[in-house]
């Protein structure tokens, strides 16, 4: 009966059998002596010791040969070296460590496009809370303070003065959310119109007046709804017209007589920019009619103004300077001028700039608050603002 090969012999025979098909044509034409050698050893089935010794002798007689080079291969000249291979691996996907940037914070889009989400790529979706005007806490010093507010309506005249100080705190909260988008068809599907709701609250707090229990001197509430349409067009000298829109705004201080102040307006607005360094925005409005008996502040448009023009300059990512002017557009020229400087404060834990700004502001004119609509003031403030969150 034929005995099974020992394990070492079986492994050796298997390796030899696998190696034979890989031999080059030249090797397959080699003398049959090498081939006959292992065949003779395999034929010694009756004597395992002699068979193992035969395979050992045959293996010792073999010499390793490198695989033959292809006949078509030619030595390459030094100057003919092939270029390095192109990496055909697929691009790396975002990992958990990668910083994901929302469209409305993607710096490859302009400031106005990100602010109003004018393009599909700068969109952050509906019903997300975003900043509107700067959210500010600042210390304010003024050349005067309105201790006994008056109005063109006798019902709205304060009966006695209050000993307010000229130095106080100012706090502003301002948020908005997009209610809808894509309301009107456009020839360019990459542009988006949108409907927004915004709310701004500004308070003057007499923090440095302990003798009168540090009251809030005035708080203005300003809800508004606005529609923004991306009127994208190239203008002369490199300017780009970015948007137009309209809105409805209510502003009031929520107080009872005689300190109640309020008005309602409809407005048109527009904005353009130059290379994301310069921005010009404008609004013009019309006050909605109120009866004389219900008008808390007659002639407010002749003081606060009927139009607003803003110019902003961003010389570098850390600084923004802006100038905002309002004008009454009437026979008597009134209004206000506001000069602002916002400077970035620090970086976040992921290395990006934070949304905190050192906010310095100088205001001169009418309407710094509703209670001061008919009182001219010059106000200087320094504080910290949160923008574009």
What do the predicted segments below correspond to?
Residues 167-173, 193, 217-223, 260-266, ...:
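Residues that define the transmembrane beta-barrel architecture of outer-membrane proteins
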Residues 26-69:
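Alpha-helical, heptad-rich or low-complexity scaffold/stalk segments
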Residues 180-195, 231-243, 258, 274-279, ...:
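Short loop/turn motifs that connect adjacent beta-strands in outer-membrane beta-barrel proteins
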Residues 141-145, 201-205, 229, 248-256, ...:
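Transmembrane beta-strands of outer-membrane beta-barrel pores
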Residues 57-61, 93-252:
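Transmembrane beta-barrel domains of Gram-negative outer membranes and organellar outer membranes
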Residues 195-199, 225, 244-248, 280-284, ...:
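Membrane-embedded beta-strand positions of outer-membrane beta-barrel proteins
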Residues 222, 339-341, 360, 377-389:
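Outer-membrane beta-barrel "beta-signal"
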Residues 239, 247-332:
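Detector for outer-membrane/organellar transmembrane beta-barrel domains
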């Amino acid at each position: 009966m034929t005995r099974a090969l020992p394990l070492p012999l079986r492994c050796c025979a298997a390796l030899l059998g696998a190696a034979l098909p890989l031999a080059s044509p030249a090797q397959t034409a080699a003398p049959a002596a090498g081939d006959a050698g292992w065949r003779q050893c395999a034929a010694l089935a009756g004597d395992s010791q002699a068979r193992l010794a035969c395979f050992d002798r045959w293996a010792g007689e073999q010499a390793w040969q490198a695989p033959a080079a292809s006949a078509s291969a030619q030595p390459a000249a030094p100057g003919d070296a092939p270029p390095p291979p192109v990496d055909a691996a697929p691009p790396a996907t975002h990992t958990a460590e990668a910083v994901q940037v929302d469209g409305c914070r993607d710096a490859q889009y302009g400031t106005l496009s990100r602010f109003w989400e004018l393009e599909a790529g700068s969109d952050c979706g509906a019903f997300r809370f975003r900043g509107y005007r700067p959210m500010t806490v600042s210390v304010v010093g003024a050349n005067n303070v309105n201790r006994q507010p008056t109005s063109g309506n006798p019902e709205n005249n304060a009966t006695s003065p209050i000993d307010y100080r000229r130095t106080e705190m100012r706090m502003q909260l301002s948020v908005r959310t997009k209610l809808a988008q894509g309301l009107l068809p456009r020839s360019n599907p990459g542009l988006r119109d949108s409907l927004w709701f915004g709310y701004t609250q500004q308070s003057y707090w007499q923090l440095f007046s302990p003798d009168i229990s540090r009251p809030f001197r005035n708080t203005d509430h300003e809800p508004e709804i606005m529609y923004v349409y991306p009127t994208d067009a190239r203008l002369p000298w490199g300017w780009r017209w970015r948007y137009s829109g309209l809105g409805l705004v209510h502003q009031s201080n929520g107080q009872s007589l005689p300190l109640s102040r309020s008005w309602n307006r409809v407005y048109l607005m527009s904005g353009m920019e130059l290379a994301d360094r310069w921005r010009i925005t404008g609004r013009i409005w019309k006050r909605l009619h109120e009866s004389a008996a219900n008008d808390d502040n007659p002639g407010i448009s002749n003081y606060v103004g009927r139009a607003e023009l803003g110019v902003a300059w961003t010389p570098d990512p850390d600084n923004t300077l802006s100038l905002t002017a309002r004008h009454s557009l009437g026979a008597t020229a009134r209004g206000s001028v506001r000069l602002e400087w916002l400077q970035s404060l620090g970086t976040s834990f992921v290395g990006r700039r934070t949304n905190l700004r050192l906010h310095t502001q100088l205001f001169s004119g009418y309407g710094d608050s509703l209670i001061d609509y008919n009182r001219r003031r010059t106000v200087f403030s320094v504080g910290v603002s949160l923008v574009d969150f």
